[in-house]
């Protein structure tokens, strides 16, 4: 009986889809130390630099379902591994 129970537990663990959750940096500073666990469907980390005026950059980092659109005076980098948007 114990063997059957143990077998059922092992099969249940193996068959469960534990899933994978992506972790991305999420803060507006140049040097970032805050992390965000991405929601279901968000499979991309991004870093967006926006030049507001000469010598003034705004950093935006986070999770996304798709790579954000690049607009004038923006630079966007996308990646798909943990904490890759440094």
UniProtKB/Swiss-Prot annotation:
Name of the protein described by the UniProt record: Probable weak neurotoxin NNAM2
Family: Belongs to the three-finger toxin family. Ancestral subfamily. Orphan group II sub-subfamily.
Gene Ontology molecular-function annotations: acetylcholine receptor inhibitor activity; ion channel regulator activity; toxin activity
Disulphide bridges: 24-45, 27-32, 38-63, 67-78, 79-84
Principal localisation: secreted
Tissue: Expressed by the venom gland.
Cellular component, GO annotation: extracellular region
Keywords from the UniProt entry: Acetylcholine receptor inhibiting toxin, Disulfide bond, Ion channel impairing toxin, Neurotoxin, Postsynaptic neurotoxin, Secreted, Signal, Toxin
Keyword Secreted appears in the UniProt entry: yes
Localisation per UniProt entry: Secreted
Superkingdom of origin organism: Eukaryota
Pfam families in the record: Toxin_cobra-type (PF21947)
CDD domains found in the cross-reference section: TFP_snake_toxin
Protein's UniProt keywords contain Transport: no
Cross-referenced PROSITE patterns: SNAKE_TOXIN (PS00272)
Signal peptide: 1-21
Job description of the protein: Binds with low affinity to muscular (alpha-1-beta-1-delta-epsilon/CHRNA1-CHRNB1-CHRND-CHRNE) and very low affinity to neuronal (alpha-7/CHRNA7) nicotinic acetylcholine receptor (nAChR).
